[in-house]
């Protein structure tokens, strides 16, 4: 059930550029395209979803790299009909908290306060990069799990905790947490609810959505002629009926009538981007006979 236990860093604070990407892929080519895209070290999440745009993934590139040029590398793959870049325009919430105890279910209402983070410009030094490389590793379950990192970095364990606390205060580290495999933990209905929100209401609706404990992620993203939905929210439920009811409960409270739920039908990749680590990347254009 446990996927990883490590520091979770903020992509943008580290100078990385990232975007959600939606693709329409010919169904018989979908698996091949997904597996080729998975080879890119900047791809952390990659899902098949039940929609005309049937492949959704996140792509992050390090400082100095061009995200659009990096995305262009995938265009040589056979079977891609459309590609839509959907970068974050406003972030309202990020951070999955799965309720593992049924009898402690939260009422579906906007009851959470937004976490306040000091907005400090952060330019990572080589020392910072070395620290991040070490602390993004999956933690070993031992008596003193930070001892090895401290030795590798020439620090004490207390100094590690102080630096992590500082990173959290300035928003460089979002949290130090365990990441669960949603499906194995019983959360089989993972829905991306996309909302068509009037422009003047985007911030209000986004903040309200972010206050629902059931919503793990919430963003404003750009629209296209064939994609009118500008606010994205994620929910994680144990059944499709529960997800449908939860969506209706949320919808009544935010008063947005035009929306869709896109469920993930297949997970092709879910991992953490390894920051400040060099990787080679090559793709095979077509399916080999």
Regions from the language model: what does each represent?
Residues 1-289:
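A compositional/biophysical signature of low hydrophobicity enriched in polar/charged and small residues
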């Amino acid at each position: 059930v446990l996927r990883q236990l490590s520091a979770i860093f903020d992509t943008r604070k580290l100078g990385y550029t990232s975007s959600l990407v939606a693709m329409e892929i010919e169904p018989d080519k979908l698996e091949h395209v997904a597996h080729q895209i998975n080879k890119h070290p900047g791809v952390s999440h990659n899902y098949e979803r039940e929609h005309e745009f049937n492949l959704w993934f996140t792509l992050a590139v390090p400082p100095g790299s061009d995200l659009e040029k990096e995305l262009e590398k995938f265009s040589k793959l056979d079977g891609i009909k459309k590609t839509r870049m959907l970068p974050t325009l406003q972030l309202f919430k990020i951070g999955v908290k799965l309720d593992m105890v049924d009898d402690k279910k939260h009422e579906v209402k906007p009851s959470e306060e937004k976490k306040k983070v000091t907005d400090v410009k952060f330019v990572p030094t080589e020392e910072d990069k070395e620290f991040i490389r070490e602390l993004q590793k999956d933690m070993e379950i031992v008596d003193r799990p930070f001892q090895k990192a401290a030795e590798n970095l020439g620090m004490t364990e207390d100094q590690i905790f102080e630096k992590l606390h500082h990173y959290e205060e300035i928003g460089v580290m979002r949290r130090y947490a365990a990441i669960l495999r949603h499906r194995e933990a019983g959360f089989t209905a993972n829905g991306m609810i996309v909302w068509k929100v009037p422009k003047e209401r985007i911030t209000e609706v986004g903040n309200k959505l972010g206050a629902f404990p059931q919503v793990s992620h919430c963003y404003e993203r750009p629209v296209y002629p064939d994609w009118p939905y500008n606010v994205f929210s994620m929910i994680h439920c144990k059944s499709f009926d529960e997800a449908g009811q939860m969506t209706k409960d949320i919808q009544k409270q935010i008063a947005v009538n035009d929306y869709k739920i896109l469920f993930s039908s297949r997970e092709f990749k879910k991992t953490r981007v390894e920051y400040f680590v060099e990787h080679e990347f090559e793709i095979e254009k077509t399916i080999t006979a």
